[in-house]
């Protein structure tokens, strides 16, 4: 029989599983979810905040997976890069940023071109048009006239055809700054892959590096023609609009602030031993990234990472306890790199297992994704009886929800619900406790008030459930565990530390979701059994 000290606390992150009462357009309410429904009714449950100022974003800004996992792991509200960079644009300090000035200096030295690459979107998840506006003002202030914009269209964190409005906004930014020209346009499907689908990235890279006269159309015309074919912004074919390829001596600023979908294209430009596809390394090239995409990349970084200390994984490791993280490819960086505050290397005693995501064009074609295998990995880790903390992410609600396909998203939700039943049974067998939550909303809002597909995240609250185990009980509580009703993601790490009996460090400013006990234990509590 396993010792009680190694009955685990298991954090289950249902990525994109938001709460919304209305059934219309709600894949979660439409789906059959007997396990989640039973857990919600049988165990202490509440709703928590995952957006805006509650996670370090501007008020009203939807959350995302990176932000969510940062807050989950840090146990404090983490000021996000979106806010940091927007502040720099608004207070003018972006005009004095050393890394950005380095790119401008190289362009002046070589009499060359400045290229601005990034997601042209107001979604605020990977980039923001306000930041592009700041870069155009910087170029103008530095006297650089040859400024070429390589626009990556969104359609995933925004409405599927919002790109045409974003192009109009860029044209206004260009007019205001007096410099800049959109020379290429490309959907994020190609330029921002993160699953090593190098055939996609190669198309984007070749668009940026092989010159030509262009297609004779404006960006707006290309998008309108794309929409007429029933294709959204995410899948816009890489298209050259005008001359202006990246060449030796040029300067490049990649203005995405979120690393995970900017890495692969960056590797193609800067790695000498790049193996994704054949290409000649462009040298010299001053390539600046807005944030640190990879600690091993030797490139100037405009906004260096924040140093987060005494985060959850670190505290667990410092007390000599072992932990396990697992997710499929699409969310693996989130339960590792982002959950650990932007640190790539695991902490001592932290084991990880990556489950490959299915190789399909879009996940509506495989809505089950790799949820079964992720569940198997988590159960195997729990059964070992050596881990005090297990963190698991189910990608399906978010990744399939992003496709805008209702039927597929319902299947994704039902798949996760079945897996959750198996997982909770394993946790109960081990005497552990499960904390079930989500990092942001998505699948609960599949189309807008006009009946158009909604493929972005939401600002809706998400569930939080404590499935208390037989050997991970909280001392001082009776038959019920009272939960706070004003919680946020940063409160979950302190809750985990309380369950593990570990002290909360002063840097961790979140508050446990569990209200102080009002009475003494009067009877035993046995986990409620749910069907699997």
From Swiss-Prot:
Reaction catalysis annotation: (2R)-2-phosphoglycerate = (2R)-3-phosphoglycerate
Binding site for Mn(2+) 1: 398, 402, 457
Pathway participation: Carbohydrate degradation; glycolysis; pyruvate from D-glyceraldehyde 3-phosphate: step 3/5
Family annotation (Gene3D superfamilies): Alkaline Phosphatase, subunit A, BPG-independent phosphoglycerate mutase, domain B
Organism domain of life: Bacteria
Pfam families hit by this protein: iPGM_N, Metalloenzyme
Binding site for substrate: 126, 156-157, 188, 194, 258-261, 331
GO biological process: glucose catabolic process; glycolytic process
Keyword Manganese carried by entry: yes
Any GO molecular function: phosphoglycerate mutase activity
InterPro entries, alphabetized: Alkaline_phosphatase_core_sf, BPG-indep_PGM_N, Metalloenzyme, PGAM_B_sf, Pgm_bpd_ind
Active site, UniProt feature: 65 (phosphoserine intermediate)
The enzyme's E.C. designation: 5.4.2.12
One GO cellular component term: cytosol
Cofactor note: Binds 2 manganese ions per subunit.
Presence of the UniProt keyword Manganese in the record: yes
Cofactor: Mn(2+)
Xref: SUPFAM superfamilies: 2,3-Bisphosphoglycerate-independent phosphoglycerate mutase, substrate-binding domain (SSF64158), Alkaline phosphatase-like (SSF53649)
Family affiliation: Belongs to the BPG-independent phosphoglycerate mutase family.
Function as written in the Swiss-Prot or TrEMBL entry: Catalyzes the interconversion of 2-phosphoglycerate and 3-phosphoglycerate.
Subunit structure: Monomer.
Protein name: 2,3-bisphosphoglycerate-independent phosphoglycerate mutase
Species this chain originates from: Synechococcus elongatus (strain ATCC 33912 / PCC 7942 / FACHB-805) (Anacystis nidulans R2)
């Amino acid at each position: 029989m396993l010792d009680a000290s190694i009955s685990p606390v298991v954090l289950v992150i249902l990525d994109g599983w938001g709460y919304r009462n209305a059934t219309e357009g709600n894949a979660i309410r439409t789906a059959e979810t007997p396990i989640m429904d039973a857990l919600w009714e049988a165990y202490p449950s509440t709703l928590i905040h995952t957006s805006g100022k509650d996670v370090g974003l501007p008020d009203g800004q939807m959350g995302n997976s990176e932000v969510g996992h940062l807050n989950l792991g840090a146990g404090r509200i983490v000021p996000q890069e979106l806010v940091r960079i927007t502040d720099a644009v608004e207070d003018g300090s972006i005009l004095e940023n050393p890394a950005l000035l380095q790119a401008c200096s190289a362009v002046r030295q070589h009499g060359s071109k400045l290229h601005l690459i990034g997601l042209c979107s107001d979604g605020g998840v990977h980039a923001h048009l306000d930041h592009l506006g700041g870069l155009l003002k910087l170029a103008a202030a530095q006297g650089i006239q040859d400024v070429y914009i390589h626009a990556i269209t969104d359609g995933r964190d925004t409405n599927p055809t919002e790109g045409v409005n974003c192009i109009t906004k860029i044209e206004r930014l260009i007019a205001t700054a007096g410099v800049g020209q959109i020379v290429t346009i490309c959907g994020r499907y190609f330029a921002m892959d993160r699953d090593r689908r190098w055939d996609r990235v190669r198309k984007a890279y070749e668009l940026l590096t092989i010159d030509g006269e262009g297609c004779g159309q404006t960006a707006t015309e290309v998008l309108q023609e794309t929409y007429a074919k029933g294709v959204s912004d995410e899948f816009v074919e890489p298209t050259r609009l005008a001359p202006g390829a990246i060449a030796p001596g040029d300067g490049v600023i990649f203005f995405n602030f979120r690393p995970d979908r900017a890495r692969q294209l960056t590797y193609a430009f800067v790695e000498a031993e790049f193996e994704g596809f054949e290409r000649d390394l462009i040298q010299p090239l001053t390539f600046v990234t807005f944030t640190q995409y990879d600690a091993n990349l030797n490139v100037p970084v405009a906004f260096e990472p924040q140093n987060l200390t005494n985060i959850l994984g670190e505290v667990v490791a410092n007390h000599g306890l072992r932990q396990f993280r697992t997710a499929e490819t699409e969310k693996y960086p989130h339960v590792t790199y982002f959950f650990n505050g932007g640190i790539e290397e695991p902490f001592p005693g932290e084991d990880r297992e990556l489950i490959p995501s299915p190789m399909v064009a879009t996940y509506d074609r495989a809505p089950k994704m790799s949820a079964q295998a992720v569940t198997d990995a988590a159960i195997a880790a729990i059964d070992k009886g050596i881990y005090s903390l297990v963190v698991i992410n189910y990608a399906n609600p978010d990744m399939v929800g992003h496709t805008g396909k209702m039927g597929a998203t319902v299947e994704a939700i039902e798949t996760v619900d079945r897996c959750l039943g198996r997982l909770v049974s394993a946790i109960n067998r081990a005497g552990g406790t499960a904390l079930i939550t989500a990092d942001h909303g998505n699948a609960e809002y599949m189309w807008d008030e006009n009946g158009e597909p909604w493929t972005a995240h939401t600002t809706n609250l998400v569930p939080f459930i404590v499935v208390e185990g037989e050997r991970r009980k909280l001392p001082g509580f009776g038959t019920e565990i009272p939960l706070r009703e004003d919680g946020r993601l940063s409160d979950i790490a302190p809750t985990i530390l309380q369950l593990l009996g570990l002290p909360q460090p002063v840097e961790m400013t979140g508050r446990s979701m569990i209200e102080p006990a009002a009475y003494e234990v009067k009877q035993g509590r046995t986990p409620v059994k749910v069907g699997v």
